[in-house]
């Protein structure tokens, strides 16, 4: 029996001691009724070794729990980040839809109120306005130190032509562009 078993089976040990004492002391006329085993006190070196073993086991268990807790934190952090990105994407999609709806409404209102203007002319005007807004935003950003932007009288027209050419190329390629266009 090892020391751990001795501590666990203290009652069994007391019973064995009682039986042995009854045998030995019975020869002298003594009758043992009960034996009280108060505590088992091992040698100091044995106690220190047992304490070190217990401490090492607790440290190992604590490390395991700490690792599991860190794993759970990382998973929750990743889930929160994924949810934030998803919600950010939903917000951007709604913002773009609102911009598209507003542009469509502005084009229709402007072309109905100002006679002789076509939807293309209104789109060109809106593109110029957005182009200047973009330049202003780039200039106001504190993160930008130098920005090279081709700027000239025909630059906005060139951008408009590039967009129209892209739409025509996609139409020739058979790509459905209706989902990208502003519908009245």
UniProtKB/Swiss-Prot annotation:
Signal peptide: none
Domain of life per record: Eukaryota
Record Gene3D superfamilies: Band 7 domain (3.30.479.30)
Classification via InterPro entries: Band7/mec-2_domain (IPR050710), Band_7 (IPR001107), Band_7/SPFH_dom_sf (IPR036013)
Record-annotated membrane-spanning stretches: none
This protein's name: Protein PPLZ12
Source organism of the structure: Lupinus polyphyllus
